[in-house]
């Protein structure tokens, strides 16, 4: 889903 792509763009700290 598109949500997955959004998560990839957000840096994981």
Swiss-Prot record:
The modification Tyrosine amide is found at residue 13. Keywords: Amidation, Secreted. It is found in: Secreted. Transmembrane segments: none annotated. The keyword Secreted applies. Coiled coil: none annotated. Its main location: secreted. Follicle, fully grown oocyte and egg. The keyword Secreted applies. It comes from the Eukaryota. GO terms for cellular component: extracellular region. Has myotropic activity targeting the genital tract. This is SepOvotropin. It comes from Sepia officinalis (Common cuttlefish).
């Amino acid at each position: 889903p598109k949500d997955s792509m959004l998560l990839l763009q957000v840096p994981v700290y």
